[in-house]
Amino acid sequence: MAAATLTSKLYSLLFRRTSTFALTIIVGVMFFERAFDQGADAIYDHINEGKLWKHIKHKYENK
């Protein structure tokens, strides 16, 4: 019974009106994009460890 109540509250809060539905999608997309970009950057950095400028610049900087 609690799941039905939670579902109905979620529906009435976020998905019932078109404006809140659109806002929910836009906010969700923004969070997904941020998480996807950070994940892709982390994978890229891991695959190219030691080859990127940020990993080797300490060898070439003047002290």
Curated annotation (Swiss-Prot):
Q: Which intervals lie on the Mitochondrial matrix side per UniProt?
A: 2-21
This chain belongs to the protein called: Cytochrome b-c1 complex subunit 9
Q: Please name the SUPFAM superfamilies in this protein's record.
A: Subunit X (non-heme 7 kDa protein) of cytochrome bc1 complex (Ubiquinol-cytochrome c reductase)
GO MF annotation list: ubiquinol-cytochrome-c reductase activity
Q: Which organism is it from?
A: Homo sapiens
Q: How does it assemble?
A: Component of the ubiquinol-cytochrome c oxidoreductase (cytochrome b-c1 complex, complex III, CIII), a multisubunit enzyme composed of 11 subunits. The complex is composed of 3 respiratory subunits cytochrome b, cytochrome c1 and Rieske protein UQCRFS1, 2 core protein subunits UQCRC1/QCR1 and UQCRC2/QCR2, and 6 low-molecular weight protein subunits UQCRH/QCR6, UQCRB/QCR7, UQCRQ/QCR8, UQCR10/QCR9, UQCR11/QCR10 and subunit 9, the cleavage product of Rieske protein UQCRFS1.
The GO cellular component terms are: mitochondrial inner membrane; mitochondrion; respiratory chain complex III
* Family from the record: Belongs to the UQCR10/QCR9 family.
The record's function comment reads: Component of the ubiquinol-cytochrome c oxidoreductase, a multisubunit transmembrane complex that is part of the mitochondrial electron transport chain which drives oxidative phosphorylation.
Q: How does it sit in the membrane?
A: Single-pass membrane protein
Signal peptide stretch: none
Biological process (GO) annotations?
Answer: cellular respiration; mitochondrial electron transport, ubiquinol to cytochrome c
Please tell me where this protein is predominantly located: mitochondrion
Give TM segment ranges: 22-47
UniProt entry keywords in alphabetical sequence: Electron transport, Membrane, Mitochondrion, Mitochondrion inner membrane, Respiratory chain, Transmembrane, Transmembrane helix, Transport
Taxonomic lineage from the root: Eukaryota, Metazoa, Chordata, Craniata, Vertebrata
Location in the cell: Mitochondrion inner membrane
Q: Which residues lie on this side of the membrane: Mitochondrial intermembrane?
A: 48-63
